């Protein structure tokens, strides 16, 4: 199958106007002092209100982690951001804007799933996997840069391809979990670590009390008292 590469953002006429709107709202990043310790709640609430389901938001000691399944942003074998994906990123951008001054770096991490046994040796599959993963993280980074919510030098796009699985690739359910976009928002002064170290913290349950999985506005409302 061919990979669809997104060549430009011109098919999204509202990107620049939205970016200017958010940029005007935050004025200068240096003035943004909202407590980064509460940022995970702001993000989760915003995503719930936007009816985004199954996003995981975690607050660690010096970072905020957010994970989405790939189908939120991209169609299969495509690096073109969907309209739905752009809307989710716009919501995410507005949510992090008030705390932008307290964020040192935003890692945008793209993951794919291993679909064939020879995926790590077949030249065509290697190329497809690496390019697709890299283009997806780049497109998310480009979209966020258009929104003017954080200094562009703080946006770092990273592509892991199939090499950081969190589930079993032998099942469709596992592959769906492995195809994902993650954000690691590092606080000012935080020391970046290997991604696997963060995963170990998540699995240990250390941050269970500061972990939110979004259910969307409709379910969130129905669960109220």
Regions found by a protein language model. Name each.
Residues 36-58, 66, 74-110, 141, ...:
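Periplasmic peptidoglycan-binding/anchoring modules of Gram-negative envelope and division proteins
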């Amino acid at each position: 199958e061919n990979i669809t590469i997104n060549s430009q953002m011109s098919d999204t006429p509202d990107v620049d106007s939205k970016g200017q709107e958010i940029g005007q709202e935050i004025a200068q990043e240096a003035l943004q002092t909202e407590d980064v310790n509460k940022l995970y709640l702001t993000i989760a609430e915003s995503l719930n209100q936007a009816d985004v389901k199954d996003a995981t938001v975690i607050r660690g000691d010096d970072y905020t982690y957010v994970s989405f399944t790939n189908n939120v942003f991209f169609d299969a074998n495509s690096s073109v951001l969907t309209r739905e994906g752009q809307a989710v990123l716009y919501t995410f951008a507005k949510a992090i804007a008030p705390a932008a001054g307290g964020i040192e770096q935003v890692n945008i991490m793209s993951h794919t799933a291993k679909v064939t046994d020879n995926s790590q040796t077949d030249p065509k599959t290697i190329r497809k996997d690496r390019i697709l993963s890299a283009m997806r993280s780049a497109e998310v980074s480009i979209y966020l840069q258009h929104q003017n919510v954080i200094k562009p030098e703080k946006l770092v796009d990273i592509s892991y391809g199939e090499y950081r699985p969190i589930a079993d690739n032998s099942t469709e359910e596992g592959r769906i979990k492995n195809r994902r976009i993650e954000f690691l928002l590092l606080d000012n002064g935080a020391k970046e670590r290997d991604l696997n170290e963060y995963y170990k913290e998540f699995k240990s349950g250390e941050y269970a009390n500061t972990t939110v999985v979004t259910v969307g506005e409709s379910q969130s409302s129905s669960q109220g008292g």
